[in-house]
Curated annotation (Swiss-Prot):
Belongs to the LipB family. One of its GO terms (molecular function) is lipoyl(octanoyl) transferase activity. The record marks K139 as: Lowers pKa of active site Cys. This is Octanoyltransferase. InterPro entries: aa-tRNA-synth_II/BPL/LPL, BPL_LPL_catalytic, Octanoyltransferase, Octanoyltransferase_CS. The gene is lipB. It catalyses: octanoyl-[ACP] + L-lysyl-[protein] = N(6)-octanoyl-L-lysyl-[protein] + holo-[ACP] + H(+). Its main location: cytoplasm.
Length: 218
């Protein structure tokens, strides 16, 4: 098994629970010969609550949430929203084999977003003690990971071209002061595919690997 290769898959628009189960199933059966993978996808509308979830982070009652489901999950972080037009990356990485820490991976993920946005002339930044990436002090990318037996699950989301309204129903990441933004507000011509191509290129550089589509491996 070549450790200089990470496989990627583009799943398109999927239900959250299906992909949650799929990544856990992948992690349960993987071994020292299993390639690391990064999954690209979007989710149908859903609110997910992480392990650090606090009370009173939903601003409206369920009748006003327009039937968007709310689920608790096993990633870090607090509440966020996923919906079509948001690029999600799940990182299924063997930390020990890559000789990196969870903090290293978080830094890589944040730099990935910053460098990708910079490629499109969108200047972004991080905030101390507030994981994620921001543009003009509005959040454009959220992070949330879990480590199980040295393997990572979950990952990041990047708002590209989506309806941001549901973020108004919650306090994103449990912070009443966070406002959300997306790529569309700075470049209305970019597509998810445009973003995905550069994400793969930057991932390859940051992880010093070849990012190869899974089904091209013989």
């Amino acid at each position: 098994m070549n450790n200089r290769i990470i496989l990627f898959q583009n799943f398109g628009l999927k239900h959250w629970i299906d992909m949650f189960n799929k990544m856990h199933a992948f992690t349960e059966v993987r071994n020292i010969n299993t390639y690391d993978e990064i999954w690209f996808l979007e989710h149908y509308p859903i609110f997910t609550q992480g392990l650090l979830q606090k009370i009173n982070t939903i601003t409206y009652n369920n009748d006003i949430l327009h039937d968007i489901p709310i689920v608790s999950t096993d990633r870090g972080g607090q509440i966020t929203y996923h919906g079509p037009g948001q690029q999600i990356l799940y990182f299924l990485i063997d930390l020990k084999r890559r000789k990196i820490t969870i903090r290293d991976l978080i830094n890589i993920m944040q730099n990935l977003i910053i460098e990708t946005l910079n490629y499109f002339s969108i200047k972004s930044h991080i905030k101390k003690n507030s994981p994620g990436v921001y543009v003009n002090n509005k959040k454009i990318s959220s992070l949330g990971l879990r480590v199980k037996k040295g393997f990572t699950l979950h990952g990041l989301s990047l708002n590209v071209d989506m309806d941001l309204t549901p973020f108004n129903y919650i306090y994103p990441c449990g912070d009443i002061n966070i406002k959300m933004t997306q790529v569309k507000e700075f470049n209305s011509f970019l597509t998810l595919n445009d973003i995905r191509v550069i994400l793969i290129k930057k991932l390859s550089q940051l992880l010093n690997v070849s990012i190869i589509e899974k089904f091209s491996i013989k």
